Amino acid sequence: MGEKDGLDQMGTADRIGALRLESGLSELELANELGLTVDGYCDLEQQDSELESVLSIAQALKLAQLLGTNLLGLLGEAEQPLKVPIARVRSALAAQLGSSAEAKEALEDEIDWDVGPFLEGSDQWTSVYTIEFIKKLAMAIEVDWQIVLAGVSNQDVPPVAGISE
């Protein structure tokens, strides 16, 4: 079994810790790059749910890049699914909802998120939403969340002042 195979068998927190050690970066360096406190970063290496529920998509993409992987790799998904560009998901969802405020409200109630910034295609949408949002949205529209997440790329993330590229 190769080293990468071992990473696939770990929980998310342990995988992040192992990738950090492999990268040679310190907890402080990663915390600074992500705009977190050291304690906030350490939570990522201790709690499996932190990556999905606390970091914005932009922060998660940055972490994956710094650790030499992609979002699905951070989550331990060995199989790389098809990618559906997030713009296509957005336009299909907008078409499905049409101009119905009721349909939009029903979706928001179902996933417990405001979809406004996502539907508007705001440059900042990846700073507003988490991976947990992508999972809930994908489930609601009956699409594999991995396909949706694979369609989110660093091109969707606006540059953040103070974070090195």
Task: List each language-model region with its residue ranges.
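Mid-protein regulatory/catalytic core that forms ligand/cofactor-binding pockets
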Residues: 113-165
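Short C-terminal boundary/hinge segments that cap the last helix of small helical domains
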Residues: 65-82, 142-158
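Residues that mark the N-terminal boundary/hinge immediately upstream of a DNA-recognition element
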Residues: 15, 26, 59, 70, ...
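Short alpha-helical DNA-recognition segment
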Residues: 24-46, 98-122
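Alpha-helical residues within the helix-turn-helix
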Residues: 21, 32, 65, 109, ...
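Short, basic-rich loop-to-helix N-cap that marks the start of a DNA-contacting helix
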Residues: 48-65, 123-139
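A short, Lys/Arg-rich alpha-helix, primarily the initiator
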Residues: 1-22, 79-106, 146-150
